[in-house]
Amino acid sequence: MRCLTKTRSFHYVIIFYSFFFLPFLSSSSDDQRTTVSGLFCGGRSKSSADPNYIPTFVEDMHSLSLKLTTRRFATESLNSTTSIYALIQCHDDLSPSDCQLCYAIARTRIPRCLPSSSARIFLDGCFLRYETYEFYDESVSDASDSFSCSNDTVLDPRFGFQVSETAARVAVRKGGFGVAGENGVHALAQCWESLGKEDCRVCLEKAVKEVKRCVSRREGRAMNTGCYLRYSDHKFYNGDGHHKFHVLFNKGVIVAIVLTTSAFVMLILLATYVIMTKVSKTKQEKRNLGLVSRKFNNSKTKFKYETLEKATDYFSHKKMLGQGGNGTVFLGILPNGKNVAVKRLVFNTRDWVEEFFNEVNLISGIQHKNLVKLLGCSIEGPESLLVYEYVPNKSLDQFLFDESQSKVLNWSQRLNIILGTAEGLAYLHGGSPVRIIHRDIKTSNVLLDDQLNPKIADFGLARCFGLDKTHLSTGIAGTLGYMAPEYVVRGQLTEKADVYSFGVLVLEIACGTRINAFVPETGHLLQRVWNLYTLNRLVEALDPCLKDEFLQVQGSEAEACKVLRVGLLCTQASPSLRPSMEEVIRMLTERDYPIPSPTSPPFLRVSSLTTDLEGSSTISHSTNSTTTFNTMVKTDQASYTSSESSTTRTI
């Protein structure tokens, strides 16, 4: 009974703290760059089970706070039965009070990882990490480094170019810190002060490569072992990026000290709570899981975190299969010997619960040979994990666009991939228990099994709707170049948006060229294929790697041209003119099935088409052709103007 009374009393203290202190922390977090960009928890070890581990951790955090009063960087290590090493780095443009405040927020958030033996947290103004070994000179790590992209999309292609330029420029600044802002793009780069110049350079060069994968989004962040790089379409750093670190006990510093002290109190309370919960899980903890636990509490979908941790060798770098904007995928071997793919999720938005369970809810109950099967998830460990069937080969884009792999796929295999993807989409649109729109069909989301059969993956953006509805109205999300025009302009989502994305995919597979690859003489891929179609020279658009096969296999070249026509049908400007996926399958498989003549895709000015591709100077095209909707063709079937583009463009 005494134990129960203490537990309840402790919960009352936590509640009191939450209502009294947290409003001050959250109210300040909008201006002082204390938004959490990423929290990464390591595995558990014998040292983290030591009774002295959490008290040592609390002492380390307090010592860092004292050191941070005179500078923006500090390290601390306490040697007891369990050694803990910690590092804090504020960005060089932060004032003393903002640095203290950022650390106060970080040290209240990072205990969420306890009792993990390691953790790191990135805020927009500082970085905090602890380990059981000395890590201060580490620069990069393929297993731990991550990046994140915002959800909202920028439609101006010049923005992506400016991001690449600005990020590269800020990364070469000397001294381990730099900011830059030009043409609506602002960037900040920061190395930890414990790194040498060469290690800093290596870390930031990798960071630049990572944020370049976000260039179509308004913001991107690279969160590496030894550095941080962020870009945005608005200025987020202070002044010119430099702030002298004077120790002045002004109002801001006093507020920061008070908040830091309160954070320290919270740490002590939290440490006590962790120790108590290691002995016994209370009923209150189970109720906090609420609907989440009840929904996935059957043995078929629920995995223990410890099982997946061991299956991946504690998320070993050697088991890493790939990395994306919202997590890293590892190969796992279950106790029964079965191979699975374990996705270790990174949540950096307030809507992470919706993002996580959207994918679980939609695909846990559907099965098709051309859809990656979700086997289950883990939600009660220090981080959330998704478990998929293991698909041994890489994604389609690595076969098509990697020069060393581009000749691996012959035409027969490419046609099989196109047909399999079509069958998977047809199942989602009408054959599954609910109608599902994928919203992000692209080459990197089509995986290939050991027989090079396609499997559609990544249902994080998918949406379902009832049979009685004609469309959904929603903010846009997806990948530029693959998104249907009516969806981008009006926010109206139907199955025909997936059909458009599929059409782009077909053109990429048959031509061996990325949709966003721009050639000054011929424009983007969609422009080039359409121009050649109007000139009756469609064969020139096909991948040159297939030329020898077309010469050897009679009829294969004509078949490939037929597939290109189907791709053009799917990318027509008007959704009503695009075929359904069932019709696409019939066009691809039935020799006598009629294939209509396609109308012009969006983004093109039909009157500017020339009768001779070789006279490139007479071809008019817009460099914004795949992303700017104010310059679209006006045809009898579709008209898109700026007056229609008032849709909110975020999820």
Swiss-Prot record:
Topological domain spans for side Extracellular: 29-251
Which protein are we looking at?
Cysteine-rich receptor-like protein kinase 42
* Entry's localization field: Membrane
In terms of PANTHER family, this protein maps to: CYSTEINE-RICH RECEPTOR-LIKE PROTEIN KINASE 3
Q: What class of enzyme is it?
A: transferase
User: Which residues take part in binding ATP?
Assistant: 321-329, 343
Native organism: Arabidopsis thaliana
Q: Which residues are glycosylated?
A: 79, 151
Q: Give any Pfam family that matches.
A: Pkinase
